[in-house]
Amino acid sequence: MTTTPVEITPRPETGQLVFKPARRGKPPLHLADFDMAGRKEFLRAAGYPAFRASQLSKHYFERFEADPAAMTDLPAGQREELVAKAMPPLLKTVRQLRADEGMTVKSVHRLFDNAMVESVLMRYDKRVTMCISSQAGCGMNCPFCATGQSGLTRNLSAAEIVDQVVQGVRALRDGAVGDPEEAPQRVSNIVFMGMGEALANYKATMGAVHRIIDPSPEGLGISARGLTMSTVGLVPGIRKFTLEKLPITLALSLHAPDDELRDELIPINTRWKVDEALDAARDYYDATGRRVSIEYALIRDINDQGWRADLLGEKLNKRGGGWVHVNPIPLNPTPGSKWTASRPGVEQNFVERLRAHGIPTTVRDTRGSDIDGACGQLATEA
């Protein structure tokens, strides 16, 4: 059997940004690429009755069914071909790693063209959070992030993004996450913090958002308030996202309050500076009423100085109060990285300095770091 060769994405040069990946083939169309009206037209164009769209949507978005034989409301002689047309397989899970006594599961998925993406499912006492990818790789080239250093392979389709969530829901239903004796839970929180800059793949990302939040059978019916959209500071994307006026949390990966350092840590800062990103984030709060999260990976002797905490506090307060929350994140280790997490005492001082400015600050939980499933570690090591 001949295997399609895997295309190796060249490692990006230092500071180089990639907004558009090299042209590749497109994934097969899936009903999750469309809203209900689009699904009806898609099936009609393929020679099937439009009402099949609602039946298929119930199987995918409500029952999370993948077996055509179980779809008994479809004609027996057409089930296989209908499912093949409207619900083609998009993700093949080739590896799973577990941590936190089975409560955290990282899945590595192979796409139709052998591109690889990862998602992470985290089960807590009263919620289930899923971290999903919007791109295979990432073009933002942040030097402390394994995903950024792998380069951008391609954008994901809306359906490839949604299917990560559906596969996570199936895993929960089947008792594959946590204690199988406990009652199954539904995914309640979705964070676009996996591989890729979601706002650089705007159309597919927003299509996925609507499939996630739209009520079933049009979508998964997950509350928009349970979603978080992360960005490194793609200001035009933030501005565009603001106009959607959805009650989704915006998370700005800042990592430095001064342009001199942020130019090195977050290369997109050479295009849109700290103040521009913070202004856009404040405007997002004004438009949506949703408090913005500032993500700040604490890197030993690089960005963890007390004066930087003070500068960050001053810049946030300059834009008013009550609109922002800071999440310091102990830097997660990545292969070949020269940087490490801040010392505990330095981390605590940074937090206390921010709180002294009246900034709500919470050190973020780093689930899955021992399976390379935490922030900045996703790099598809299959």
Curated annotation (Swiss-Prot):
Entry keywords, A to Z: 4Fe-4S, Cytoplasm, Disulfide bond, Iron, Iron-sulfur, Metal-binding, Methyltransferase, rRNA processing, S-adenosyl-L-methionine, Transferase, tRNA processing
Recorded superkingdom: Bacteria
InterPro entries: Aldolase_TIM, Methyltransferase_A, RNA_MTrfase_RlmN, rRNA_lsu_MTrfase_RlmN/Cfr, rSAM
A Pfam family hit: Radical_SAM
Positions contributing to [4Fe-4S] cluster binding: C138, C142, C145
Cofactor note: Binds 1 [4Fe-4S] cluster. The cluster is coordinated with 3 cysteines and an exchangeable S-adenosyl-L-methionine.
Top-level enzyme category: transferase
An annotated Gene Ontology molecular function: tRNA binding
Residues of the active site: E118 (proton acceptor), C375 (s-methylcysteine intermediate)
Record-listed S-adenosyl-L-methionine binding positions: G196, E197, S230, S253, L254, H255, N332
Major site of localization recorded for this protein: cytoplasm
Role summary: Specifically methylates position 2 of adenine 2503 in 23S rRNA and position 2 of adenine 37 in tRNAs.
Name under which the protein is recorded: Probable dual-specificity RNA methyltransferase RlmN
Organism in which the protein naturally occurs: Kocuria rhizophila (strain ATCC 9341 / DSM 348 / NBRC 103217 / DC2201)
Organism placement in taxonomy: Bacteria, Bacillati, Actinomycetota, Actinomycetes, Micrococcales
